[in-house]
């Protein structure tokens, strides 16, 4: 009985031992040339470059969400927020300020958008609750 047990253990060990060829090597796949798509895949958009859709908004510089105010207001720390303000107090504080109702493309457009509401195109530093501190006329306005 012991002989049979030892024979089974040796047979199991011999069958579990690795052989010369355990698994076949995976095929070597080189990256596609020039960032293309591997030939065995279907390229999207017929192989062309997909269009970039930004949602219809112009590029932004971060100061005015969704807009492009790099030509509306000066760059820097002050006077970077485009606002439509109706009344000003000595260039220090402006009352009843709000963001433009649509995205202005340039200074004249910014002035036209604000004039439609009866306000003036201003670049302010700290707009808070309808009151804006330290304002000046927007670039490209009269």
Curated annotation (Swiss-Prot):
Q: Which GO terms describe its cellular component?
A: extracellular region
Expression is induced as follows: Expression is highly induced in the presence of root and stem powder of Shanxin poplar and under nitrogen or carbon starvation conditions.
Please name the Pfam families in this protein's record: Hydrophobin_2 (PF06766)
Quick one: where is this thing mainly located?
secreted
Q: Which domain of life is it from?
A: Eukaryota
Compartment(s): Secreted; Secreted, Cell wall
Name the UniProt key words of this record, in alphabetical order: Cell wall, Disulfide bond, Secreted, Signal
| Disulfide cross-links | 73-123, 84-114, 85-97, 124-135
Q: Where is the signal peptide?
A: 1-16
Sorted alphabetically, which SUPFAM superfamilies does this protein's record hold?
A: Hydrophobin II, HfbII
Q: What does this protein do?
A: Aerial growth, conidiation, and dispersal of filamentous fungi in the environment rely upon a capability of their secreting small amphipathic proteins called hydrophobins (HPBs) with low sequence identity. Class I can self-assemble into an outermost layer of rodlet bundles on aerial cell surfaces, conferring cellular hydrophobicity that supports fungal growth, development and dispersal; whereas Class II form highly ordered films at water-air interfaces through intermolecular interactions but contribute nothing to the rodlet structure.
Its quaternary structure?
Answer: Homodimer. Homodimers further self-assemble to form highly ordered films at water-air interfaces through intermolecular interactions.
User: Record's PANTHER family?
Assistant: HYDROPHOBIN
Write out the similarity annotation. Answer: Belongs to the cerato-ulmin hydrophobin family.
Task: Indicate what this protein is called per its UniProt record.
Answer: Class II hydrophobin 7
What organism does the record attribute this protein to? Trichoderma asperellum (strain ATCC 204424 / CBS 433.97 / NBRC 101777)
